[in-house]
Structures are given as C-alpha cells and as structure tokens.
C-alpha cells in the first residue's frame, strides 16, 4: 500500500542562485572576482601535500573515529590553542565539519526521540537548519542581539523540545563572537546539548581564539576542521570533542553509518594540526585582505566593519537590501558576494564578502572600487 504524505524536494543549493550576479560581474576587463563562497584558495603547506602523496597507495579501511595519530594531533592542537587537557581518546574524527553538521540532528534524535527541535542562530550557516530538515525535525531560529544568541528570546516550549542548540563563534557570516561560557551554562541548566562550531577560531581578531570547552565538557561539543585553518577544504577532515557520553555515542553510531576519513588524509591532516607556523602566515593574509576591502568599500558608502573573527565582511548600505547591494557591487567592481538572505531572513539587508581570493585579485577589486 502506498504511503500518503508530502514528499521532500530539496531546495536549490544557496550558491546556485548567484548566476545572475556572476554574469553582471563578468563585464569587467579581468573578469569577476568571486568572493561569494568561503573556500580558501591559498596554497597549503608543502609538507602536508607530501605526506598525502606518500600515503596514496593505502587501501585499507581507516578507523571511523580516526587513527590514534590523528586524534592525538587534534588533541594536542586544542591543548596548545585553548590551554585544555584533552587526549586523543576524548574526541573523534568527522568527514569535514559540514557532514557532521548535516547529520548530527538525525543521529541525536535516534537516542532522544522525545526531542524534536533544533535551535540555531537567526543569521547562520544554512546547514544547521538543513540538518534538522533532513532528520525530519523542527528548526527554530534564535534571535541575535549584537551578534550574540539571545537565549532569553527562546520560547519555553521550544526549550523543552530542544535536541541541540547550535552556536558558531566566530560566526559565519557575521564575524561576531558569542558568549561561549553563557551558552554552556544555559545548556546545562536546561538539559540541552550545545554544539559550538569553531572552525574559524584561528581567525579570531578581537581576542585570543576561544573554545566552549574552556568552560567544561559536560553538555557541550566543539567542532573543528582543517578546511579553513590549513587551506585544506577538499581533504574533508575535522573532529568533534566534548561531553564524553555524547562523543562515545556518536563514535558508535557514525561507525555503523560508515563515516570515515581516508587514512592518507588523516596522516596528512595530523601534520597540519601539529604545525602552527603556516596558520600564522594565513592569519596575516586574511587580516591584510579584510583591512583592504573594508576600507575600499567605503568609496561606495558601504558599511563593512572589520569583523571580530572569521575572514568575512558583513556589509550593508543604507537604502539597499542584500540583493540590491550585491547587484551594485557586481556592476561597479566585478565583485560577486552572497546576499545575506542566504543565511536567514534576518540577514536580508546585508551581504557577505569572503576575502578568499589571492592578493592580486582583491587589490584589483579595491582599485575598481576606488575608481567607481
């Protein structure tokens, strides 16, 4: 007997909606300068690529939770960066953080079927909400005040039904830093798992890099990746750490799902986590680029404040919504940016600009803005 119900049709992928902007930006000599997607383009460290090449013949299944070398390297990096005390047994690998974000709600709901709601920032990475949708769950936005989650705005009934609260600090797309200590305390008080996506932590400008794990492990997870830190987005390697019971459960269920980072990638990524020098070089690049574009955009009376963290400028212009501002930038400078609507209705009057193009391309964008 056929089931009767409403079938799921995936929406258009957000960045597929930018083709018109790319066409407008193509009229410039030198072509468009695509700052719409936060994919690093700078070269990774040579020693990481050399290690990957050495392991290319490996064919065996790697441990789903990650090799001990990989987990130890990730733990040692966290301990250096955040003054923590983790071992490789306290965390596990994931196939890049997007995969983890998209699958977490479904896995947690199997364990806590009475909870059916995912809470996430009103302006945020679209996959937080999509992960809830793919699991057949409710997704509820949490308002932001000065870039931070306004926990007092969450309806009591949604708190009772909440499976997880997502946080992202530094934020994609706003670049804001959140009160991680306050989030951890709120989650413990209400019995809601708080998952802090910290993949931009290395690019924190307003303070030292911070992790929610500095405020204890119980009831929280932190999520990290080498995609942004080490310019290795295509490697698809990250890890999660925190609440021992949750980490243990996820290790088991993810193993059943067959989720694993290829062994040669883990070996190369372990070397990336062990080295901080290449990250300092990248920090310098992004800081210079953010300063360059933040200043150049003033020529069009675009407000593009230097972020507290991340490699994004969250921009606005009085009288224009995000699509209109994106159109203006494409027409006047050949820049392709992401309208803020892609990150939630609360972002309608903004655009996100990712400074991930090489220096010469961003200098060209700045020159076009100066001449406009």
Describe the residue ranges of each PLM region.
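N-terminal small-domain helix-loop-helix segment of the aminotransferase-like
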Residues: 2-99, 272-273
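PLP-dependent enzyme catalytic core of the Aspartate aminotransferase-like
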Residues: 76, 328-337, 343-372
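PLP-dependent aminotransferase-like
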Residues: 106-167
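A short helix->loop->beta-strand "cap" motif at the edges of active sites that frequently abuts
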Residues: 116, 189-193, 218
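Active-site phosphate-binding strand-loop segment of PLP-dependent enzymes
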Residues: 145-206
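Conserved core segment of the aminotransferase class I/II
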Residues: 216-287, 372
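Conserved glycine-rich beta-strand-loop-beta hairpin in the small C-terminal domain of fold type I
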Residues: 266, 270, 286-294, 304-316, ...
């Amino acid at each position: 007997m056929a089931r009767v119900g409403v079938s799921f049709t995936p929406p258009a992928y957000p960045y597929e909606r930018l083709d018109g902007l790319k066409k407008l930006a193509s009229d410039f000599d030198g072509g468009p300068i695509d700052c719409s997607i936060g994919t690093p383009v700078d070269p990774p460290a040579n020693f990481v690529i050399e290690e990957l090449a050495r392991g290319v013949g490996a064919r065996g299944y790697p441990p789903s939770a990650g090799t001990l070398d990989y987990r130890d390297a990730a733990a040692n990096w966290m301990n250096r960066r955040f003054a923590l005390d983790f071992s490789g047994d306290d965390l596990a690998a994931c196939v890049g953080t997007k995969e983890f974000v998209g699958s977490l709600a479904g896995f947690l709901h199997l364990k806590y079927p009475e909870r059916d709601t995912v809470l996430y920032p009103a302006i945020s990475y679209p996959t937080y909400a999509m992960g809830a949708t793919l699991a057949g769950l409710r997704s509820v936005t949490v308002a932001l005040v000065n870039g931070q989650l306004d926990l007092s705005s969450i309806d009591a009934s949604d708190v009772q039904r909440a499976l997880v609260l997502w946080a992202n600090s530094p934020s994609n797309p706003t670049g804001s830093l959140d009160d991680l200590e306050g989030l951890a305390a709120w989650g413990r008080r209400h019995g809601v798992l708080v998952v802090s996506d910290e993949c931009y932590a290395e690019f924190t400008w307003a303070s030292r890099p911070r992790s929610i794990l500095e405020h204890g492990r119980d009831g929280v997870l932190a999520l990290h990746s080498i995609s942004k830190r080490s310019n290795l987005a295509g490697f698809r390697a990250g890890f999660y750490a925190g609440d021992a019971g949750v980490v243990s459960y996820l290790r088991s269920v993810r193993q059943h799902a067959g989720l694993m980072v290829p062994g040669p990638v883990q070996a190369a990524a372990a070397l990336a986590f062990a080295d901080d020098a290449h990250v300092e070089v990248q920090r310098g690049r992004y800081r210079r680029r953010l300063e360059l574009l933040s200043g150049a955009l003033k020529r069009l009376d675009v407000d593009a404040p230097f972020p507290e963290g991340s490699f994004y400028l969250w921009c606005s212009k009085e009288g224009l919504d995000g699509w209109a501002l994106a159109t203006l930038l494409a027409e006047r400078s050949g820049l392709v940016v992401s309208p803020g609507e892609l990150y939630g209705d609360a972002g309608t009057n903004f655009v996100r600009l990712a400074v991930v193009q090489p220096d010469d391309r961003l200098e060209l964008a700045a020159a076009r803005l100066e001449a406009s």
